[in-house]
Amino acid sequence: MTWRVGVATGAGTCGELVQGVLSDGRSFHVTCPINKGSRVVLALRESRQWRVEGVPAGRQKLERAIRLTAETLAGGPYEINVEHSSELEVGKGLGSSTADILAGARATASALGLNMDEDRVAALAASIEVSDGSMYPEIITFDGRAGVPIRRYDWWPQFAVVLVNPTTSIDTDSVDFTDQAPLSAQYDRIVADLDLAVAERDGGAFARAAGESARLNQLFVMNPWLDVLERETERLGADGVNVAHTGTCLGMLFLLPAATDAHATEKIDAVRRRASSAARRLRAVLPDGLRVGLAETPVWRESRAGSLDVGADPLY
């Protein structure tokens, strides 16, 4: 029986820009996908019984995604050999498990010669965990329990992110956000503010919303480094700060100019230099053991015809 090979990636996140509960009871988050993630290479062939080998310890959701995808798309059973690599640590709020699920599902579909669109991948991910919305190549408002977008925007800002990664971790599956319900009116307002920000092409409003949500989240998951990062954000002239609402990582946000701006390349390079300088500053002032890195969120571009082109700059 012939082996068939599939290769795919899944984007990670720097936490979320916003996360909470709306007045209609839906849990939501505004995604912060980044250009770091997981990669899966797998080979499969028909077999008399299921066998999945090569999945690293602690990555059980990856195995579930691979097998569930194969069962859903083609039945099975299959023998599957997996090679997995990831830039994302577990328990930090970097979207590691969702990135694994995305990479595993897409690689399996690719090996089978089939495609899974974003909505189908989202539904599969939500059947395995309360997922991030990083299967969509953009900033969206997402219901991770139902696996469906709440808002898909016709514009979103792009950020250079200085990612601060403490050594501590959290069991993200154990965090209970039902206590956020009394604050639902505030979260309704934040989502409405983002709708207005999209209409006005106001990227700064996304950064401000992220900072407000980070501060509200201190009531539920205390991040001991938020105060420090807020002070450094003001000192360094960054546009905002965000956190992993169910993890430990934080981000300092630098709004990148639109690719359509005059002299866009020079302006974007200047912001990236500022972000790099901020990363060096944070490495100097933060205690040893807090890792500091750089990432970026997906770019938005509009074609000359005015249609949305989300594939112009892939995450990988």
Predicted regions and their residues:
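DPxDG-like acidic metal-binding loop motif
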Residues: 92-118, 134
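A generic structural motif
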Residues: 81-83, 248-253
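ATP-binding N-lobe of GHMP and related small-molecule kinases
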Residues: 1-92, 309-316
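Fold-independent oxyanion-binding glycine-rich loops
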Residues: 10-14, 19-20, 34, 55, ...
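Short beta-strand
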Residues: 240-244
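Active-site catalytic microenvironments for nucleophilic, acid-base chemistry
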Residues: 68, 72, 107-113, 127
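ATP-dependent small-molecule kinase catalytic core of the GHMP/sugar-kinase superfamily
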Residues: 116-239, 253-316
